[in-house]
Swiss-Prot record:
Organism lineage string: Bacteria, Bacillati, Cyanobacteriota, Cyanophyceae, Acaryochloridales
Annotated binding of a divalent metal cation, by residue: D12, E13, D108
Pfam families the UniProt entry points to: RNase_HII
Enzyme class: hydrolase
Superkingdom per UniProt: Bacteria
Designated name of the protein: Ribonuclease HII
A Gene Ontology cellular-component term: cytoplasm
Main location (coarse class): cytoplasm
Protein encoded by which gene: rnhB
Keyword Zinc-finger assigned: no
Length: 198
């Protein structure tokens, strides 16, 4: 690889605040040319993009990325470790799953990934300033959203296809009426409250 930027991986996670489902991380390595192309297509923080735009960009990222990988931590791991440690575990799994080892990981936020045998730098709001992190945020968001839509078929009644596992009014109401599923995070207060008798 003759382009130094091809050795830089962006890492981000989604689903930290959700009540349902795993936390998902992605890592993406992009060449300078790929960054230029994706930025010209409007790539930015996934939260600022419509679902349709995220899907288009996700397909473009997968086409032009030097490498990418998704990692996740299960609801069981979230409840056992806590959401921060589970998020970092998902990030670590994503990076270690890359086909080649990057020279540097740019990690969104202010927490370093523990036990990562790769140099890393944390970047607060990195999904807004680092193209590699923005790409990772899009990949992770689309992947997790698609998973939650599939799980909505298995666990009807919680409006998961709409809320993507986050604590909307409908979701909280369903928790009170139906109780939690195996994919709800019992370490989160709204899920715990649904287990208490009225």
């Amino acid at each position: 690889m003759d382009d130094a930027s091809e050795q830089i991986a962006g890492v981000d996670e989604v689903g930290r605040g959700a009540l349902f489902g795993p936390v998902v991380a992605a890592t993406v390595i992009l060449s300078d040319g790929a960054i230029e192309q994706l930025v010209a297509q409007g790539m930015t923080d996934s939260k600022k993009l419509s679902p349709q735009r995220r899907m288009i960009l996700m397909n473009q990222i997968r086409e032009v990325a030097t490498g990418f990988r998704v990692g996740m931590a299960s609801v069981y791991e979230i409840d056992r470790l806590n959401i921060l440690q589970a998020s970092l575990l998902a990030m670590r799994r994503a990076v270690l799953g890359l086909p080649s080892t990057p020279q540097l990981c740019l990690v969104d936020g202010n927490q370093r990934i523990p036990n990562l045998p790769v140099p890393q730098r944390t970047v607060v709001k990195g999904d807004q300033s680092e193209p590699e992190i923005a790409a990772a945020s899009i990949l992770a968001k689309v992947w997790r959203d698609q998973l939650i839509v599939r799980l909505d078929q298995r666990y009807p009644g919680y409006d998961l296809a709409s809320n993507k596992g986050y604590g909307s009014a409908k979701h909280r109401q369903a928790l009170r009426e139906l109780g939690p599923t195996r994919q709800h995070r019992l370490s989160f207060a709204p899920c715990q409250a649904s287990l208490l008798p009225d």
